[in-house]
């Protein structure tokens, strides 16, 4: 606990050295000469202090590494673009969905808008009707989903489209910073840090070596009470596209999730909380673990209108310690256990969050290419059962978002305000998730 406290206090001290003049600009709006929806004009620069060796280029690639794990990022969206870990044969595999060319993430924003690998915010997931009420005041955020009827992932220009500043950089960690001066009509100013780090027990003469990737977002409300709910939006494929889909390859276990948030056809919460074992004949029951594809044909309509698959918020049931901002996943039972039959790669996820959103890539349709580097790696090794997967097909990946109960700000009866509403008088909003990889 002392180590956790020390690390978080250092982060908070770092906040104090960054004044509200530290602003971030939106890259694709600068390219197009447009204006963000908060009415300010992007100026193509940032007054945040850059880390030594860092660049103001939003598409500059940064790589951190430890023994048998390598992660690469770009500042555009504080985005993870590659994560290399070993499979059961010791071959390094990229288990992240995305693009090889950083420029393609900008193109994606303007076309598919997949949110590959980015940090979403200021408020992840959906806001019903793009509106919420705080202390009697109604706030309206840009409606950017379903014919502009609701808000998704923070609005039209969310954190995924901002150029975060690299404010700390080492061989095994990187920190991005974003000052949000009322973006997308959210109240008040918020300073955000996200630190990614890697660790490894390979080479330490320990049994069952493992690698570890950690994402920590720390956000402070500086001026007003406001919703804050950031989340890493990482698309995973633990079989590294050796198979067209994850349906018969990937096992998913959610041992702490016996409940889920019921949603309507727009994926907006109805206010009801369902039981995974008694609802929908157990289609959403992953408490004991099963293949993604085992019950997916029965998952008709639970991921929205005219949709078959998963796009659901699973509640993490455990003694509640998320209000303690010193809590860390190292003290917690894993909330996710996922593994690939093909590669033998296993991933355990621990988090201090209240819920996990699982999305089975229902909307992919083969129009987005698999990274050329992943295709080349599979060709070179002869993997893929004689076939080469070069397009991201439906159910070709899985998104895991560590976050709070979705749209909790519009469901006060749930009692989630302490974990989603923050003010200058409150502690920081912290999303801490650790992904541990082994292979067998």
From Swiss-Prot:
Q: Does the keyword Zinc apply?
A: no
Q: Which residues form the active site?
A: 233, 401
* Localisation: Secreted
List GO molecular-function terms, semicolon-separated.
Answer: aldose 1-epimerase activity; carbohydrate binding
Which InterPro entries does the entry link to?
Aldose_1/G6P_1-epimerase, Gal_mutarotase_sf_dom, Galactose_mutarotase-like, GH-type_carb-bd
Protein residues bound to substrate? 125-126, 311
What is any Pfam family matched here? Aldose_epim
According to its UniProt record, where is this protein mainly located? secreted
Chemical reaction(s) catalysed: alpha-D-glucose = beta-D-glucose
Its pathway is: Carbohydrate metabolism; hexose metabolism
Q: What GO cellular-component annotations does this UniProt entry give? A: extracellular region
The record, for Gene3D superfamilies, names: 2.70.98.10
Some GO term, biological process aspect, for this entry: which one?
glucose metabolic process
- Signal peptide extent: 1-24
Keywords, alphabetical: Carbohydrate metabolism, Glycoprotein, Isomerase, Secreted, Signal
What top-level class of enzyme does the UniProt entry assign? isomerase
E.C. numbers: 5.1.3.3
Q: Using the UniProt annotation, give the residues that carry a glycan (glycosylation sites).
A: 32, 38, 43, 68, 112, 129, 147, 163, 171, 199, 243, 275, 281, 306, 321, 337, 365, 385
> Which family is this protein grouped under?
Belongs to the aldose epimerase family.
Q: How does it assemble?
A: Monomer.
Report the protein's function.
Answer: Mutarotase converts alpha-aldose to the beta-anomer. It is active on D-glucose, L-arabinose, D-xylose, D-galactose, maltose and lactose.
The entry's protein name is: Probable aldose 1-epimerase ARB_05372
- Tell me the organism: Arthroderma benhamiae (strain ATCC MYA-4681 / CBS 112371) (Trichophyton mentagrophytes)
